[in-house]
């Protein structure tokens, strides 16, 4: 099993494209097996597997800092940062929490559990980095409806004029727990429909650079996009379109019902 050999992000950097595909399959199988016994968030994590592999392939955590909004979609991140046994061995299913936790790993920046906090937290990390004269990448990962929260908009407003390295990965699956509504999400749908070319672009309007990845479940496309923005000297949004629940038929068909689950029969 390839996942058994991944003890930290450095092990990802030597994988081939085919091995990354296989690793994603193994990670989803581990997520599925654990959720069937333990319960927990489901759809968000299944949609983020390839993006998490790509992030840890390109960036250099924990030097580069990841801030996961809510952090309910960080199970894959935990698997790849030395905590895989908590997803492979039933005896260790309770060894990790359902959210990021600095007491578990140096790869986790904050104890998070509430929505829309990542952009403000990440902007603070970027400001502190600059005051210290350091140069690591600061990466905020936000999705599942969090972008329309008030604190996220405050963070976006601040980041838009920071004029320093700040990378926002917008995980767009057109969902919160349930279907999203409102003018902001209408604009995001226009961006998806035009491969990121719509002039109705909130991020550009607020002063941020912008990249669009049509298939956010394609590790190679994601790696190319993340390499393009690594060490960038200004704020940028990488807008990735993912499928919530990807890889498990029932979760793909009922994205709201499979946002979170109690233990269940896999078949």
Give residue spans per PLM region:
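Residue-level signal for pocket-adjacent positions within structured domains
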Residues: 1, 7-10, 37, 82-85, ...
């Amino acid at each position: 099993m390839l996942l058994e050999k991944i003890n930290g992000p450095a092990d990802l950097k030597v994988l081939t494209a085919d091995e990354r595909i296989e690793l994603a399959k193994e990670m989803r199988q581990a997520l599925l097996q654990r959720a069937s016994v333990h319960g927990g968030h489901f759809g968000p994590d299944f949609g983020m597997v390839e993006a998490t592999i790509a992030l840890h392939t390109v960036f250099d955590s924990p030097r580069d800092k990841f801030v996961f909004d809510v952090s309910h979609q960080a199970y894959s991140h935990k698997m790849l940062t030395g905590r895989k046994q908590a997803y492979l061995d039933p005896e260790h299913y309770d060894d990790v929490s359902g959210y990021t936790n600095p007491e578990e790993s140096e790869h986790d920046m904050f104890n998070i559990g509430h929505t829309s906090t990542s952009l403000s937290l990440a902007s603070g990390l970027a400001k502190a980095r600059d005051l210290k004269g350091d140069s690591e990448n600061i990466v905020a990962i936000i999705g599942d409806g969090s972008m329309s929260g008030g604190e996220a908009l405050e963070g976006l407003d601040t980041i838009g004029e920071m004029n320093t390295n700040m990378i926002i990965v917008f995980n767009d699956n057109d969902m919160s727990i349930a279907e999203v509504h409102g003018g902001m999400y209408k604009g995001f749908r226009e961006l998806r429909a035009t491969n990121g070319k719509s002039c109705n672009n909130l991020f550009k309007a607020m002063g941020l650079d912008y990249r669009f990845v049509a298939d956010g479940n394609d590790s190679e496309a994601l790696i190319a996009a993340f390499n393009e923005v690594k060490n960038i000297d200004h704020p940028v949004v990488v807008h990735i379109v993912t499928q919530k629940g990807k890889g498990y038929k029932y979760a793909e068909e009922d994205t709201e019902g499979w946002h979170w689950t109690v233990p269940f029969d896999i078949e």
